[in-house]
Swiss-Prot record:
Residues 77-89, 126-157 have a biased composition (Basic and acidic residues). Histone H3-H4 chaperone that plays a role in maintenance of chromatin structure during RNA polymerase II transcription elongation. Required for several aspects of morphogenesis of C.elegans, including regulation of division in the germline and gut and specification of ventral-uterine precursor cell fate. It comes from the Eukaryota. The keyword Nucleus applies. This is Suppressor of Ty 6 homolog. The lineage of its organism: Eukaryota, Metazoa, Ecdysozoa, Nematoda, Chromadorea.
Amino acid sequence: MDFIDNQAEESDASSGHSDDEEPQSKKMKMAKEKSKRKKKMVASSDEDEDDDDDEEENRKEMQGFIADDDDEEEDAKSEKSEKSRHSGEDELDDEDLDLINENYDIRETKKQNRVQLGDSSDEDEPIRRPNHEDDDLLSERGSDDGDRRKDRGRGDRGGYGSESERSEDDFIEDDGDAPRRHRKRHRGDENLPEGAEDDARDVFGVEDFNLDEFYDDDDGEDGLEDEEEEIIEDDGEGGEIKIRRKKDTTKKSTLLESIEPSEIDRGFLLPGDKKIAKEDLPERFQLRRTPVTEADDDELESEALWIIKYAFEEGTVTNQADLDQDDKLDCIMNLDPSVYEDRKKAVIKSIKKVLQFIRVRSNSFEPTFIGFYRKEDIDNLLTMNNLWRVYDFDEKWCHLSEKKNKIYDLMRRMREYQELSDDLTAKRRPISDADLMDTKYAETLEQLTDIHANFQLLYGALLDDMIRWEKGRLTGEEEEQEYRVKFKSSIRNDKYQMCVENGIGELAGRFGLTAKQFSENLNWKKHDIEQDPMLPLEAAEEYVCPAFSDSDMVLNGAKFMLAKEISRQPQVRHSVRQEFRQSAHFWIKPTKKGRDTIDQTHPLYDKRYIKSKPVRSLTAEEFLFYHKAKEDGLVDVLIMYESEEDQDSNNYLVNKYLSDSIFQKDEYTENVEQWNSVRDECVNMAITEMLVPYMRDELYNTILEEAKTAVAKKCRKEFASRISRSGYLPDFDNNDDDDDGMDQHGARRIMAVCYPTERDEASFGVMVDENGAIVDYLRMVHFTKRTFGGGNNGLRKAESMDLFKKFVQRRKPHAIGLNIEDMECTRLKRDLEEAVADLFSQNLIYKPIPVFLMDNEAAKVYMRSNVSLAENPDHPPTLRQALSLARLLLDPIPEYAHLWNIDEDIFCLSLHPLQRDIDQEQLALVLSHELVNKVNEEGVDINKCAEFPHYTNMLQFTCGLGPRKATDLLKSIKANDNLIESRSKLVVGCKLGPKVFMNCAGFIKIDTIKVSEKTDAYVEVLDGSRVHPETYEWARKMAVDALEVDDSADPTAALQEIMESPDRLRDLDLDAFADELSRQGFGEKKSTLYDISSELSARYKDLRQPFQEPTGELLYDLLARSGKEIREGAKVLGTVQSVQYRKVDKDAADSMLPDVGEDGLFTCPCCKSFTSSAPGGIQEHMLGDSRQGGCPGTPVGIRVRFDNGMTGFCPNKNISSSHVDNPLTRVKINQPYYFKVLKLDKERFSLFLSCKSSDLKEDDLSQRDQYWDEHQYQADLELMKSESKKKTEANTRVKRVIAHPNFHNVSYEAATKMLDEMDWSECIIRPSANKDSGLSVTWKICDRVYHNFFVKESAKDQVFSIGRQLSVGGEDFEDLDELIARFVQPMIQISHEITTHKYFFPNGTCEETEAVEQFVREKKRELGRSPYVFSASYRQPCQFCISYMFDNTERIRHEYFKIVPHGVRFRHQNFDTLDRMMAWFKRHFHEPPIELRRSAIPAPQYRVGAPPAAPYYPPQFVGYH
């Protein structure tokens, strides 16, 4: 606004026009701008007619209770008005905004991810970068989404230089005719820091870089609608006239808009980056998610108590004991109870002191500085890991305090609104002092979440009214309004609010206890239940309304209201949460995709079926595997409170809240019983339907976060192990003749050899000096070939080894490193060692040079990185890999720090299988902690960082610095002749502030010897030690005292002398010196003095463990990393490499008799493969040399090779279940087979295998989880077998190509379903399920009965086509039409005649004997005579049964007949039609069947009930049964 007004005034002054002459549109615009700046509110009785501007103001007022994480936006708005300052202090987080917006149906615009160059708006607000800080109030862990961005401020695009310096930019050479244009310009880059243009040139590599291309010319004027420009034209008389025209306001594309924000971030060019670099505060303090803030003593005391509770004492839900050992307080573990409390108080005091160092602005010390230089203040009770944990939990405390203050202030405002306003609705539930105290003393984000959820339920609908009321008080224009309705309408349209609006809450208040009273009764019965005299439904009658039309609806609404309020009570939630987490169980079951995907190599193979496993038994990152599998659709995860035993015994969670009579009246009247039942329903609804699902999701997220934290800790531990050891340090004392007069000050020569995985590529060796710079390199084309290989391989190998020997003889490295790529590395290492030994034996080198196998992963990451390509553009990839390997052998820390670059190559390291599934910023945080520790422990040679690019990244991990401050510091050094002579120059020359200097000074070392060679200035010897500048005087005093010279002696000379003979420091009484310092007011400094003494004895002595070559289990893990993991019990595919023989005992060969075969030939008793016609040949074979065709020995097994280069042994007894003499009878060389790993010995690199089918089929039950669900496993196994069988059958059936309306390529089941929808006369012809040369014909007889017969095909042209001849029952047919007409349709017609007969039994089949006989008797009663009944057979389709009474005893006989193509066959006779059969039957029904007459044993003339299977009569044709 001010900018626009000023521009308008300048235009007026320059043009000489009055206000009246202003263009009307511009005057209206200015008037509108001024009207927007006025703070007034026009009261209106009709809110529905408010205009858009009023709604916009109301939205801004919402910021009074909605958190906005964008602190820069708050700062920019804080200067606008008193009102916005008031609301800005009371904001909640984005999650609260989402909740309230959801409740109020407010839509908000999504934040943009790209940097925006916004036009200057009417209100002249600065351009801001969206803040991605996670302020999730509803998460205890605080960072579920995990993509927090760097906190770099963004502001208005500033300029570099004055307006006069920019005047030439606008200069246009006048050609005499063209009009000159003078545009009123306002630079949008005035606020950019000094020197930013130079920085931009460095980043973009452009010498003529012009910042004008980054910003619009009219950046400050884009918000104006009517902008003008002056055009000076010649008036034709030698004069000039000025013409004002409207400027073209078309948006122009700028260079900055075309650049990705990430590219801009890399250059640290933004004003916020410059501010961070220049501010005298550690950069990590400024970039922390919740920045470090000032705190008073009371807050620090509370925070120290909170940290020791939640950081070191509070347990996790899952079992993380093994991983938490590094973070535990060793000083108070396993102490006697009498000592524990005193020690704990001392630890709390130390934690408070650490917090003072961090949060008191006069200190601002990082944890690393505290651990090194403030040991006495923490009484040596806290380790470095403990200090970082305190630092991390300080961030959580600040985050918690920020949220707590916002919630507390919101509740305070609501309470003020309740007390002072006339809103009767707001007064129904007053906020008490206890509610405010609960908020003030909340200790976890979970507690705050519960408080906030309860507040949202009870008071969320009143927030708009509260805002309007506060707005009226601020403006002084609030009009008193008379509330004409008892319940005000709410924006929210949920079920609870509907109940509130219709007064159902009054009925909920008559249940006997409020939700608050119920929660207070959980621990002890504090409140008695007030019993209502009316029955529940009678009481509900009083509240019937249009929305709740009957008493049942009213009562249900009241129950829902009370249940909702109970479920939001913080005490209830806390109680349910504790119960749920203590006893929760989970179930795991693989999905169909999981059953096919999870094999023995999957980490969940032995844990894929889990039943009722307690959540507390989960360990480390186990649950993250389940979560990842669930996200991939491999398993289903179910979490429940009750175990299977609890479910069987009906022991549910809600019973704990129903059984204690918390909400029960102890009376037995009908009224009380009904109310007790209603109360139980409320509690059950609150617990089971509302809280349990919420707690299930919360628990899931909690244990998932714990699993992710476990992965981060394991990554930290693995990373720490890689940088915890120093580089190789040669023994210079015994190396005098080897250096040829070289300066031995750190002069190490390291060589590394790398061979590629592709054997046809060349291998490379490289030599680096003590600075990691390349001295020389070597190319060996045939290094990977074998010395005794076939053809010319041996000669080519010798050529490469000769090159290697000459290189070593010339360069004389102190050590040689070889990459661990696969198992070949062990052979190649032997080749190098033999070459070195050969040189030493010939006296070509003065001592043996050690050869080390080295972890190759970091070197390969560097090889593939953009950084390596930029630094070594002319070197092939393998040479770049060798360079990195040599630097790792020299010192691993600079090389790992080198990977922490703008491309984040450090995350390409494989530290854990699940490292990609956790928050990458969380991973970066823990890795940076370790790197900061080790970098500062080693010290940073700042001149080396300025000189060598691969050392540069170490500087950002120096205590107090960061990437921005390190970049800024290096620029200052480069401007200072690339040399820092002393630590004091960091302040004088590089302008480091006192706080940053205090943090970093002790860890920045100056190589005093090399600096002395480059400058004549005084060099402080202590600058090359860990002694901090604040204690230099004490170090000098110690040197003078140790030499026992006069105090007037030169302390510098004393220091030089004491460093040459440090043994004299042992005579110093440092304890007395410490006492003297304490008396002088310096405090306890004993540890500091001892550290100074140690440092004077050996300046910057490497405190890391010495370099050690990987061996044993570690070497095995590195070798096995190239392929799939091999573990005991696993089934692995391997290739048979050779047969293993046991050598022949030459002495016992004479006593061994050859075997004689049936053919008369003699067989060798050892190898079992050589035969001879005479025993002498066998004897000669056994005594001969195996390399010349002699007996190789007795075969004992086979040697197997796996894809990762590992080899294993499978003995004869494990090849087959039967006896095996010669393995080659069972397996073949170079053929792959599956083997089971029975035993794995990592120390000896041996695998003991078996390929017996019995071993391969069996799973290793010992590896299965304790809670393995065997029942579900077996059920799924049967299901998989069934599916596999169906799939096999489907795949084996040939799809037929037959053009006929009755033919379908379907199965029998599908055909029956189709027939159910078709007419009775239809049939389906389909492929036979058993033979490709056959068809099946199916038709429906009656309900559930289908007839099916086989048709044989012959004379087929193709397997999928129909045969030219079809045969059924001895009859042949030419085509399907003839088959249907002559064979199928006659039988269908007869069967239809039977099923539609008036005496047919339609309600079942003949196998249902009792039902058929009952139907016969019903027909007899109906007809008055003995009837007969037809029924179809289910077991034998196409056969029917006739049931009838054959005498006066009402006994029923059942006889079977069947239909044939030419009629009906009954009692071994054929009948053309059913009528003829029945005519014959009526004449002979009293005669027994032939089978009964032929029986040898007298049998009854009747049979009661149907037989187990219908009697079978041999048909006259075959094939259609």
